[in-house]
Amino acid sequence: PEDVYSSPNGVQAVLNSCYGYISQSNGYGGYLHMLLSWHTPTMQLQNRNSTYMVELATMNVAVDNSTADYVYDGAYQTINTVNDLLMNIGLCSGMSEAEHNRIEGEARLLRALSYFNLVRIFGALPYIDRPAASIEESHKPRTSIDRIYGLIIGDLEQAWNMLPEKGAHAHGRPHKWAAKAFLAKVYVALACIKEHPGEPFDAALFDKSAKEYWQLAYDNAKEVYDSHAYSLVPNFADLWVYTNKHTEESILEMEMNYVTGSCPFMYRYLPGYWEGVPLTNSSNNYGQIRPSREAWDEHNDRYPGDWREECTYLDYKYKCNTTVENENYRGKQYYIYPYTKENYPDQSTSKYEYLPYLRKWVDPTFTAGNANVNFIVYRYADLLLT
């Protein structure tokens, strides 16, 4: 640790690795999407041939489910690296106080986010705030959810005090208002626990009422709103242009690119060999996570003619690349929802029914399992809905 933490560049490299771990395939780069999507009313699993996927879609998850394991282990990998940084950052003597505070504030924000994801998915779990030097040290008893949430709030409050103001931060890195925005999100979660008590979230563990937690959520969100630290992008479609990174609407965004190999999540949403990306001999676009028919119907019933649909869904039909080496797919056209086998325009088309796709995350230069598409963890639009 002495060598790594001997210079500001070394400390920054450790912080960068924290971002790398949380955005890798075990986290926002892939498996977290799968774990949290298939069982919801808005998303659906198209292919039910995989046992572990069906378990997630039906919320009947076996103890050895690999996706749950990946997410759990990946979050603790981030946490362990943050813990190491927080323990050893003091070894760096050549760092300004402002730089020290900025790095520690970002690290605490990432640790809070990691535990926030874990506690909402798994309930009570081990709280580890020091780097584990051995397997034995990493095996700790579970901590109750009220204490976990208290520690999450503590990290976010410290991040609020340590992170720089907007304008004093480097582009693409969170400033202090991100911590305040996440505090609002945490208090929303606590209000929901109080309003909907039940295992694994024992509402009796929390001393405030749902109304009080809603008020705390509102107060923190209102502070962010009044700060004018964020704003909505004028054109909704611009959010999904892969070159538009870290817009004024982005509160926290994971930087992903094909060099680091941290962005396999895109192919979880797109169809294989789709002409929108130049794949030729690989079907890395699996399209495993799809909007449900009900979600598509509700959107179109509520907002008929909504221009946002074009940049949100890939629907009706799509065509495969003409350069695909496999001639069975080359140039082939597929009809997808809202077309069904009863109303396909071309009656020679396969009678299989296909769900629509999400088309928000598209890198047209994508040729393999990774891409240059960032993932926005938290948008200002999300905060405005608090």
Whereabouts are the PLM-identified features?
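An aromatic- and glycine-enriched ligand-binding surface/loop that stacks and positions planar moieties
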Residues: P1-Y52, L86, L125, Y149, ...
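Short, flexible active-site-proximal loops enriched in glycine and acidic residues
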Residues: F122-I128
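Acidic, serine/threonine/proline-rich low-complexity intrinsically disordered regions
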Residues: D129-A132, H139-R142, K194-Q215, N374-T386
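Short, flexible loop/turn elements at secondary-structure junctions
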Residues: P131-S134, M256-Y258, Y313, D382
